[in-house]
Amino acid sequence: MAQQEVVEGFKFEQRHGKERVRVARVWKTRQGQHFVVEWRVGITLFSDCVNSYLRDDNSDIVATDTMKNTVYAKAKECSDILSAEDFAILLAKHFVSFYKKVTGAIVNIVEKPWERVIVDGQPHEHGFKLGSEKHTTEAIVQKSGSLQLTSGIEGLSVLKTTQSGFVNFIRDKYTALPDTRERILATEVTALWRYSYESQYSLPQKPLYFTEKYQEVKKVLADTFFGPPNGGVYSPSVQNTLYLMAKATLNRFPDIAYVSLKMPNLHFLPVNISNKDGPIVKFEDDVYLPTDEPHGSIQASLSRLWSKL
């Protein structure tokens, strides 16, 4: 999106923005039920403000403090609850339409996972607790109206105590890892998926569509990792499980064009302890040493053949 210019004999690209703008928004229904979101917002603007770099002329700059204030102003204007994706698009669209010099905007949001609490079997009308994984999104909007929308998950921690192994890998003089067909498989999934919508006018009009889609994608990823409740599904490697999770996402959601997954292999090492008198702890698939330093790092992406990504 950034345009390269020749300035005083040099190639030059620039952008500016505001990061880590924290905003919370509460909506209240007539029935007394409250809804809350907490977002960390980042903004990047692409604009014709070269003079601010070359000389003392700031007349074309949108101040980053103005960007911060705009986040709160637009949150105030949102009278109905909306998804992080819709708010990101709303903000980006504002910057490219309101400011003549701004040619494009990137807005990214990380949503803090506040979840409604259950008290005595009933959803509390205004009580929330902090969950674990985070909902992320990034909207890229250009003055022409073109759009790229990406959503994601950070920190989806999953573990299964069996139905995992790793065998027949390359062996050489540096290899010490034994083959195993029985191990704990644990990871913290970072997922990104990009929607196929290419303009603001092609977006679904259903309220909270992207919030629902986030929950549905998360369920597909987890269900594919674990398999059926009785018996599960065998994982011959993190690589294979990652691929199946990405493929299941594309197969389930036709409006998703691209999926990227990062899945570190968080190790649970068998514990065997002995002394001269014999075993103190004999490992029988029961006692482990959990460690994530160092850990394996596995990542891959999958996209449809017609995708431009």
From Swiss-Prot:
Urate binds at T64, D65, F166, R183, V238, Q239, N265. It is found in: Peroxisome. InterPro entries: Uricase, Uricase_CS. GO terms for cellular component: peroxisome. Keywords: Oxidoreductase, Peroxisome, Purine metabolism. GO terms for molecular function: urate oxidase activity. It holds the Pfam family Uricase. It is an enzyme of class 1 (oxidoreductase). The keyword Oxidoreductase applies. Its main location: other. Pathway: Purine metabolism; urate degradation; (S)-allantoin from urate: step 1/3. One of its GO terms (biological process) is purine nucleobase catabolic process. Belongs to the uricase family. Homotetramer. Catalyzes the oxidation of uric acid to 5-hydroxyisourate, which is further processed to form (S)-allantoin. This is Uricase-2 isozyme 2. It comes from Glycine max.
